[in-house]
Design a protein with these regions (language model features):
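Sec-exported extracytoplasmic/periplasmic mature domains
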Residues: 1, 8, 15, 62-70, ...
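Ligand-binding pocket segment of bilobal, Venus flytrap-like solute-binding proteins
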Residues: 1-29
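Solvent-exposed, acidic/flexible segments
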Residues: 3, 31-33, 49-57, 160, ...
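Extracytoplasmic/secreted envelope proteins and their assembly/folding machinery
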Residues: 7, 57-61, 168
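Solvent-exposed loop/turn segments at secondary-structure junctions
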Residues: 7-11, 31-34, 47-48, 68
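Periplasmic-binding protein-like
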Residues: 20-44
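Mature extracytoplasmic/periplasmic domains
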Residues: 43-140
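Conserved C-terminal helix/tail region of periplasmic/extracytoplasmic solute-binding proteins
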Residues: 111-177
Length: 177
């Protein structure tokens, strides 16, 4: 079975398939893939230049970006946040809770998330999950792709109407063969 979908939807699909006793994996073609991230933004000068609305928007972004609220949002929507937590380890601990191996798990492998949670070399080994070997190509790889996957991926761009038509035709051909 082949399906193209957002990584969060892929995780949801894998979770639902498990309920039926099926094990699906997540893969990114060697040729590359789209990179995407979800985050909040606001207009530089607020809404219609209104200082109070700008302050309200900033307060909302600050609130939703707090690590405790990031975790609530990730839990609810099933997607990884653009927020890594700053000085807080809460989001990494949540990733460990979601994907880390149980203490009695025998076949585990390290899954390095340092690129996401830290830029400092001195914390290189601090952000490594021990995951069940089966998880390395499943949910954790969909939520936190390895750096090798990120290097062969590109941020999506807006396409013209003609480019959208060509891309839609391409996907129809993929589905038909």
């Amino acid at each position: 079975v082949l399906n193209m979908q957002w990584s969060g939807d892929g995780v949801y699909t894998m979770d639902e398939a498990e309920k039926d006793g099926l094990e699906l994996s997540y893969a990114v073609p060697e040729e590359g893939s789209n990179l995407w991230f979800d985050g909040f933004c606001m207009m530089k000068n607020g809404i219609s230049g209104d200082a109070k609305k700008k302050q309200a928007a900033q307060a909302f972004i600050n609130y939703i970006s707090r690590p405790d609220n990031v975790i609530r949002n990730m839990y609810y929507v099933g997607y990884t946040s653009v927020i890594a937590g700053g000085d807080s380890d809460l989001i990494f601990k949540y990733a460990d809770w979601c994907y880390g191996a149980e203490e009695d798990e025998e076949e585990v492998s390290p899954y390095d998330l340092s690129y996401f949670f830290s830029g400092a070399k001195e914390t290189k080994n601090k952000y490594v999950l021990e995951v069940p070997k089966s998880q390395a190509s499943r949910q954790v790889s969909a939520q936190y792709p390895k750096q090798s996957v990120l290097k062969r991926s590109a941020v999506m761009q807006c396409f013209s109407e003609e480019a959208n038509r060509r891309i839609s035709r391409m996907w129809i051909r993929v589905r038909c063969f």
